[in-house]
Amino acid sequence: AASDVYKRQTIQYGDADVMIAGGTESSITPIGIAGFSALTALSFSEDPERASIPFDKERNGFVMGEGSAIVVLEELEHAKRRGAKIYAELNGYGCSSDAYHITSPAEDGSGAATAMLNALKDGGVEPEELTYINAHGTSTHHNDLFETRAIKLAFGEHAYDLKINSTKSMVGHLLGAAGAVEFVTCVKEIQEGYIHRTVGLRETEEELDLNCLLYTSPSPRD
């Protein structure tokens, strides 16, 4: 995700017309597993269907995954001149740092809320115009709870009108490739008019009361 932001800035500042951005990760190794196990971040579920279950009340950690996604970012008029197929437009981005903890975000979600609001402001979009969020949704207790708080903090009552899902429910946590793969997922969802469900999500807890697209619910098309 950081790569996409940097490359967009490079084009926006006029330093380049076309940039390649993305991420890749191959971290399922003994040291990778040992490190995240030491952090008690990995799921200990023996049932594959109940392992990576973002926003579910029985979530107990994430499942490591591997993958890669690469995108071509291009200045709009330059792309039009060469007749490029345009899949989507990257309107804005937002960054923040709550300086709370090296691995855990601020419990009130303020840092993530600031990033979302900054992205909307940069893109010239009002919060009420947004209809969908592809959440970080790692399936850890703290992330999913604090991220839900962040969405509520950023969007207020409109948070309950949003459709929210987590791609990690299907592919696990791709670490350095997560942002890039989920970026491509969002583009394809826009292109196909289809929002995938949060696979494995069966029942949420009281505070996780947003529309995170239960696995048993129909996938919306809009």
Locate predicted features.
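Conserved catalytic cysteine-centered active-site region
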Residues: 1-4, 38-63, 149-180
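Conserved small/polar residues in nucleotide/adenosyl-binding loops
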Residues: 1-9, 215-222
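Active-site-proximal alpha-helical scaffold in enzymes
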Residues: 3-25, 63-84, 173-195
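Conserved small-residue
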Residues: 7, 36, 72, 90, ...
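Beta-strand segments within the central parallel beta-sheet cores of soluble alpha/beta enzyme folds
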Residues: 19-24, 85-93, 128-135, 162-169, ...
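Condensing-enzyme catalytic core mediating Claisen C-C bond formation in acyl metabolism
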Residues: 47-123, 132, 198-201
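Short glycine/threonine-rich loop-to-helix capping motif typified by GTGT followed
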Residues: 100-109, 138-155, 174-181
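Flexible, low-complexity linker/loop segments at domain and module junctions
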Residues: 123-129, 160, 209-217, 221
